[in-house]
Regions:
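Sec-dependent signal peptide cleavage junction
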Residues: 18-34
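Exposed beta-sheet edge and beta->alpha loop/turn motif
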Residues: 118-165
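Polar/charged side chains located within well-ordered beta-strands of beta-rich proteins
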Residues: 64, 80, 111, 160-162
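A short, amphipathic edge element
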Residues: 95-116
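Positively charged n-region of N-terminal signal peptides that target proteins for export
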Residues: 1-4
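Hydrophobic membrane-insertion alpha-helices, especially the h-region
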Residues: 6-21
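Core segments of small alpha/beta cavity-forming domains
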Residues: 38-102
Length: 165
């Protein structure tokens, strides 16, 4: 009987560890580490691997969160046109706080790829963005659902939802 309790306890402990391992072991990286290489940019959605879909999703989330560092609205507008199929400025202006953050870094947990078709996929993740705000390090946690499509041979965000925690 004691053996059974020990085995069950070990299984529960392992299950708890496994569910939190991503958050514990994920490390912050700078935005340049989330850029897409040329080979990946040239792939079609139907040929992307699961890992590559995550890379594309991470790229778009970091590009959106980078707006926290921007100093003028024209940069926000340009970034919106670069990322979104339409209405990019409206999406990004929500994250625009001029001169608020510096030295941003990003990490991701709970990444999932959902609703994969030949034309699109849905990327879900919890993103953490950390940076210097008024001389102190601040961290924000944001849940993202990003629908990625390829338009004119360029990956773009068709729609997204974000929830700040």
């Amino acid at each position: 009987m004691k053996k059974r309790i020990v085995i069950i306890s070990i299984c529960i402990a392992f299950g708890l560890f496994w569910s939190y391992k991503e958050a514990v072991f994920a490390t912050f990286k700078s935005i340049d580490q989330y850029e897409l290489n040329k080979e990946l940019k040239n792939k079609s959605i139907e040929t992307l691997t699961h890992k590559e879909m995550k890379q594309v999703g991470e790229h778009f989330v970091t590009a959106q969160l980078s707006v926290f560092e921007f100093h003028n609205k024209e940069d926000v507008k340009r970034k919106g046109e670069e990322i979104f199929v339409s209405r990019g400025y409206e999406q990004l202006i929500q994250n625009y706080y001029p001169n608020r953050f510096r030295d941003l870094e990003y990490k991701f947990t709970n990444e999932e790829i959902r609703e994969v078709t030949d034309e699109s996929f849905l990327y879900h993740a919890v993103a953490y963005v950390a940076g210097t705000e008024n001389g102190k390090r601040s961290e924000i946690k944001v849940n993202y659902d990003v629908k990625v499509v390829k338009v004119n041979n360029i990956f773009r965000v068709l729609e997204q939802k974000q929830y700040v925690q």
